[in-house]
């Protein structure tokens, strides 16, 4: 599927600033609430959805539906994907400065981490 033209719906910094408001909120597997609990792909789906940008529900689907970009060419607002035993099992929003904001796990909830807290295996862009 070709990604929709999301030009003008949001800038990378708007995506990041919105996402950062939810740092400290809980991680809940399968969750869709930015305040009461969300998982990694639910987090990205809800953040982008706030700006009218539709993302699929799973990390693997989000990786395949956006415009694929080189991990070294990421800009704030791009999505980074991480391997989970041979498949894409985690997604985070690049926030700039070598960091990502993501719904990490039940221990840390929504948090900011170094891009390379794990090795990113793919990146995708949904805003232009």
Task: Give, region by region, the residue ranges found by the protein language model.
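Aromatic- and glycine-rich peptidoglycan recognition patches
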Residues: 2-10, 17-18, 53, 64-69, ...
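Stable alpha-helical elements in mature extracytoplasmic
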Residues: 11-15, 19, 39-40, 47
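Catalytic cysteine-centered active-site loop
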Residues: 25-76
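Short loop/turn microsegments at loop-to-beta-strand junctions
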Residues: 39, 89-90
């Amino acid at each position: 599927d070709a990604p929709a033209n999301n030009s003008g719906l949001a800038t990378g910094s708007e995506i990041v600033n919105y996402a950062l408001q939810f740092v400290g909120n809980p991680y809940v597997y399968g969750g869709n609430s930015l305040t009461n609990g969300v998982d990694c792909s639910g987090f990205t789906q809800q953040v982008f959805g706030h700006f009218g940008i539709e993302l699929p529900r799973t990390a693997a689907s989000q990786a395949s539906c956006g415009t694929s970009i080189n991990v070294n060419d990421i800009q704030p607002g791009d999505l980074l994907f991480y391997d989970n035993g041979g498949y894409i099992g985690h997604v985070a929003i690049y926030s700039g400065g070598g960091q990502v904001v993501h719904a990490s796990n039940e221990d840390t909830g929504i948090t900011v981490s170094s891009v390379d807290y794990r090795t990113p295996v793919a990146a995708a862009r949904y805003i232009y």
